[in-house]
Regions:
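Short, conserved, GDST-rich strand-edge loop motifs in beta-rich repeat architectures
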Residues: 2-26
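Short loop/turn segments immediately following the C-termini of beta-strands
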Residues: 9-11, 73-75, 120, 130, ...
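Beta-rich, blade/repeat-based domains predominating
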Residues: 15, 52-64, 99-111, 146-172, ...
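Short loop/turn segments immediately following beta-strands, especially the blade-tip
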Residues: 34-41, 81-89, 127-138, 189-196, ...
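A short beta-strand motif characteristic of beta-propeller blades
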Residues: 44-51, 91-97, 140, 151-157, ...
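Blade-loop segments of beta-propeller domains
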Residues: 44-112
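Blade-level signature of beta-propeller repeat domains, shared across WD40, Kelch, NHL, RCC1
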Residues: 324-328, 341-359
Length: 359
C-alpha cells in the first residue's frame, strides 16, 4: 500500500482573497491522507493526517528521511516540518517563518541539505538550511521579496513585480528554477549561492502567459513550462536541465476554449506528459519522443471540476487527479499506450491541491 498525502486549502484562505459566489470548495483542516493500492488502483480515504497547517498548498518529502515539508499559503508565509510516522501519520515538529508572503511551493535539494521556498505574494525565494534530522536550522533569503501583496481575485498576477509560483531544484542539484507569473519569466539561480546571486539563465515568455510550473526531461536537454494565462505548453532547450530558450509552443486547447492549466507531470518512463486543465475539466495528454519533443495527443475528462493536482504514482501505473472545486480525487489507470483511463469512483477530499507519496 502507498500512503498519499494531500495538500489542501484551509478556511483562512478567504482572509486573503475574495471568495467567488460560485466557489464550491470545502475547506480542509490541513493535510489529508489517502491509501492507494498501486497494483489495482484502489483508493480509500483515511482522514486528516495533520491538522492546524495553514493551507498547505504544496508538499515535498525529504530525499533520505521520513520528513515532510509543507508550504503554508498565508501571511506571513511559513514552512511546516512534519515527521512521517507509520501508516503515513504526521506529527508537526515546527512551523517557521519563511521570510515571504504566501508560501506557494517548497522543494528539497537531492542531498537533503536545503529546502527552498517560493512565495506568490511578494516574489521572495528563500533557503531553509536543514540539520541531520531534517529540521530547519536557519532561513536565509536567496532573492528578497519586493512585490506588493496580492489583493482581490486569486489570479490577479500582473502589475506589481515578481510573483513566484514554483521552485524546482535541477536533478543534479546545481540550479534553482523558479516560475514567475508576475514577470512572465523562468529564472534559474545557482543553488547554494549567497543572497541575490546572478542568474544562470532567464527565459522570457509572452505577456500574460503566466508561466506556472516547470518539468524536466531526463535527458537534461529539454524542459517544459506550462502557461496558466495562455493555456500553452512551452518546450525549452535546456543545458544540464537549466532552461535557456523556448523552442516550441503547443496550445493545449482549441482557440476559443477557456482553460487554466495547473500542474504538469512527466511519467517516469519519460514518454507521456500530463497537464491538468482547470475550467476545461480535463487532463491534456502529450506524447514525448526520445529527444524530449512533445505532441498533443488529446484530452481525458478529469471526472470533476477544476483539476488542480496531477501526479503519477510511484509505480507509473496510475495517475491521480485532484479536482479542486469538486472536492474529489480520481484514479486513472495508465495503459501501455500511456493513455489514462478512469478507475473506480471519485474519492471525497476537501479542496485537493497537491500530492506526495509517502511510501
Amino acid at each position: 500500500m502507498t500512503d498519499v498525502l494531500v495538500g489542501c486549502f484551509t478556511a483562512d484562505l478567504w482572509c486573503y482573497f475574495t471568495r467567488p459566489d460560485t466557489d464550491t470548495t470545502i475547506s480542509s483542516r490541513g493535510i489529508e491522507r489517502l491509501v492507494l493500492d498501486d497494483d489495482t488502483g484502489a483508493l480509500r480515504p483515511d482522514g486528516v493526517a495533520a491538522d492546524g497547517v495553514s493551507s498547505p498548498q504544496y508538499l515535498a518529502l525529504h530525499p533520505g528521511l521520513p520528513v515532510l515539508y509543507a508550504a503554508e499559503f498565508a501571511r506571513p508565509g511559513r514552512i511546516a516540518v512534519l515527521d512521517v510516522g507509520p501508516g503515513g501519520r504526521l506529527t508537526r515538529r515546527a512551523s517557521v517563518d519563511s521570510l515571504g508572503g504566501m508560501a506557494v511551493a517548497v522543494t528539497v535539494d537531492p542531498a537533503g541539505d536545503v529546502a527552498y521556498v517560493a512565495h506568490l505574494d511578494d516574489g521572495a525565494l528563500t533557503a531553509c538550511l536543514l540539520d541531520e534530522r531534517g529540521g530547519i536550522r536557519v532561513v536565509r533569503p536567496v532573492v528578497p521579496g519586493m512585490a506588493q501583496p496580492m489583493t482581490g481575485e486569486r489570479f490577479a498576477y500582473r502589475g506589481s513585480g515578481s510573483k513566484l509560483h514554483q521552485v524546482r531544484v535541477t536533478p543534479d542539484g546545481g540550479g534553482l528554477v523558479v516560475a514567475d507569473v508576475g514577470t512572465d519569466s523562468v529564472v534559474t539561480y545557482p543553488a547554494g549561492a549567497g543572497p541575490n546571486p546572478a542568474p544562470l539563465s532567464c527565459v522570457g515568455f509572452p505577456e500574460a502567459s503566466f508561466p506556472r510550473h516547470v518539468e524536466f526531461h531526463p535527458s537534461g536537454r529539454t524542459a517544459y513550462v506550462v502557461g496558466e494565462g495562455d493555456a500553452t505548453l512551452y518546450e525549452l532547450e535546456a543545458r544540464q536541465h537549466v532552461p535557456v530558450r523556448i523552442v516550441a509552443a503547443h496550445r493545449l486547447v482549441p482557440d476559443g476554449t477557456t482553460a487554466l492549466p495547473s500542474e504538469l507531470h512527466l511519467h517516469p518512463d519519460g514518454r507521456t506528459l500530463f497537464v491538468g486543465l482547470r475550467r476545461a475539466d480535463a487532463v491534456a495528454v502529450l506524447d514525448v519522443d526520445g529527444e524530449g519533443a512533445v505532441r498533443l495527443r488529446g484530452h481525458e475528462p478529469s471526472r470533476g471540476r477544476n483539476p488542480r493536482a496531477v501526479r503519477v504514482s510511484p509505480s507509473g501505473r496510475h495517475l491521480l487527479v485532484g479536482n479542486w472545486d469538486s472536492n474529489t480525487v480520481v484514479v486513472f489507470e495508465i495503459g501501455e499506450d500511456g493513455w489514462p483511463r478512469p478507475l473506480g469512483e471519485p474519492v471525497e477530499v476537501p479542496s485537493p491541491s497537491s500530492f506526495a507519496f509517502a511510501s
